[in-house]
């Protein structure tokens, strides 16, 4: 089953969040990007557990734009291995989904 729309999650340093969110919307790679300013992340990196304050971007977009969105974000993202993951939208408000189509 193919899904037309997806939600993309991107973690980033807090000071980079707005720049990346603006890039996504300005390039019409996402209809909307929400910024959750501060999350606590705990993860494995280079053999040890790390803890950081990060921001979480939540992007609503079309699935066919994901690869382009990923490549554009990787160009400006400061992390060596940025989290850029997509989850399908399996159902939603039809008016909102239409707005995604019209906005990106």
Spell out what each predicted region is.
Residues 1-104:
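Positively charged, small/polar-rich N-terminal and surface patches that mediate targeting and assembly
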């Amino acid at each position: 089953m193919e899904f037309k729309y997806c939600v993309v999650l991107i973690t980033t340093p807090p000071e980079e969040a707005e720049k990346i969110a603006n890039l996504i919307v300005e390039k019409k790679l996402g209809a909307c990007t929400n910024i959750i300013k501060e999350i606590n992340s705990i993860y494995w990196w280079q053999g040890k557990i790390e803890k950081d304050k990060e921001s979480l971007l939540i992007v609503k977009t079309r699935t066919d734009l994901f690869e382009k969105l990923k490549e554009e974000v990787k160009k400006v993202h400061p992390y060596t291995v940025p989290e850029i993951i997509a989850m399908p939208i399996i159902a939603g408000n039809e008016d909102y989904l239409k707005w995604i189509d019209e906005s990106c």
